[in-house]
Amino acid sequence: MENVYDIAIIGSGPAGLAAALYGARAKMKTLLLEGMKVGGQIVITHEVANYPGSVPEATGPSLIGRMEEQVEEFGAERVMDNIVDVDFTDKIKVLKGAKGEYKAKAVIVATGASPKLAGCPGEKELTGKGVSYCATCDADFFEDMEVFVIGGGDTAVEEAMFLTKFARKVTIVHRRAELRAAKSIQEKAFKNEKLNFMWNTVIEEIKGDGIVESAVFKNRETGEVTEFVAPEEDGTFGIFVFIGYDPKSALVEGKLELDETGYIPTDDNMKTNVEGVFAAGDIRVKSLRQVVTATADGAIAAVQAEKYIEELFAE
């Protein structure tokens, strides 16, 4: 099986990189298939303070850069190609990319998930420049500033409360007249003196020249439009969007079992419903999506893939 890899990994975020590292260290012929953007969501994170052992000056790109170095040190092959189709029906799995076709004994799907966008003008252009989708990652950049949180579910309210530890004022902007978060979470939120609420309101536009400088909001009931401008002493403010995630699972739809929201269910060993196919990182059904959990998933998936190969392909 000269042209067949032992392990092929789709996705090059922390989960995919960790899987490649563990696969290569185990002397598996390992292929890391990267899309056009290496590193996943973490590359837009300025600082990574919650990854165990990270140095104070660690950034998302620097952490990913070190992971890439380790992957190369242990001999994993890296190919930049967008996988457009997969065939998991046979013992040897086939992955079809824009640049070529790849075959492997085991496949690890680590395609990740993307935060849902608010969908207003200026959002994409100012992501990482005041617009964020991760309070844990970026809260301290808004120390003693004003912050707006878009959303009204559990995550939005919990992240808003976390942000009150840093910001002087946090305003939850919710399109409905009441929160969707669990009652216990709401009770805590309403007792927090630094939390404010804009009901029946949506964000219409985010403005700024290289940094968030103002935001336009519209009341869905009255039609009233208001614009918040960054206080002169701050120069900017934060906009955190928490309206859910979109799993990047279109590639495996109809090929693997997905839950009702599009995530891949696995067991504790990262096994999917298809023999020889594993899933790791944010694409999985899981309770916490962080760099540390993604790398753990990747490590487990690679180790289990190795065991699967040794059992099924034993000479």
Swiss-Prot record:
Cofactor details (free text): Binds 1 FAD per subunit.
Enzyme class: oxidoreductase
Annotated FAD binding sites: 34-41, 282-291
One Gene Ontology molecular-function label: thioredoxin-disulfide reductase (NADPH) activity
Cellular compartment(s): Cytoplasm
E.C. numbers: 1.8.1.9
Family under the similarity heading: Belongs to the class-II pyridine nucleotide-disulfide oxidoreductase family.
Subunit structure, as described in the record: Homodimer.
Protein name: Thioredoxin reductase
Gene: trxB
